[in-house]
Amino acid sequence: MAPQLRIFVPPHPLIRHWLGIARDRQTPTPLFRTAIAELGRWLAYEAVREWLPTIPAAVQTPLAETPAEFVDFSQPLAIVPILRAGLGLVESVQQVLPTARIFHVGLKRDEVSLEPRCYLNHLPEQLEVNSRVLVLDPMLATGGSLLYTLDLLRDRGVSAEQVRVLSIVAAPPALQKLSQAYPALTIYSAIIDEQLNDKGFIVPGLGDAGDRLFGTP
């Protein structure tokens, strides 16, 4: 059977809570930043639930020896935030995965063509074999930025099966493109909205995540 794009919208009350705060146009920049970070934290918990390799062990409690299980941190982990909005997710996701290496990719959308232009690429020429990669892209509108980043990862030996994407808001146009180009991909998003406007912004969305994170256009 051919692989099919998997997208999960976790039914967690704290995800809905922080999403509501992030959507509210009255939310000030510091609180918006907190909301995005918290969404990153809870989405990361969900994304790695059955994804991280573990190793069995035994520990001695104050009373007896008992079986235990630990994350196998010898397996390479990477976090790839897509700048600039992806920066809002980095710190909280890194707290969930403290051993992960971070590789920044900076993309700016052309306001006419809506296509991404790369101004920063800190990915190595080749990632470690069997790396697990979390890509942070808060707004999946047209999908151009994520597709560009996935192409960069593919060229460095990373398959879609090795990647999980964290997004705050996703829209059908992006998901359709991703399902065609990378059907084996897995995405975790706080919500899927209905449409894009004529400027390529998600509606209802939450506005420009980068502008609201940093208080600057």
From Swiss-Prot:
The keyword ATP-binding does not apply. Pathway: Pyrimidine metabolism; UMP biosynthesis via salvage pathway; UMP from uracil: step 1/1. Binds 1 Mg(2+) ion per subunit. The magnesium is bound as Mg-PRPP. GO terms for biological process: UMP salvage; uracil salvage. The keyword Membrane does not apply. Keywords: Allosteric enzyme, Glycosyltransferase, GTP-binding, Magnesium, Nucleotide-binding, Transferase. Uracil binds at I202, G207, D208, A209. Its cofactor is Mg(2+). Catalyzes the conversion of uracil and 5-phospho-alpha-D-ribose 1-diphosphate (PRPP) to UMP and diphosphate. Belongs to the UPRTase family. This is Uracil phosphoribosyltransferase. It comes from Synechococcus elongatus (strain ATCC 33912 / PCC 7942 / FACHB-805) (Anacystis nidulans R2). The gene is upp.
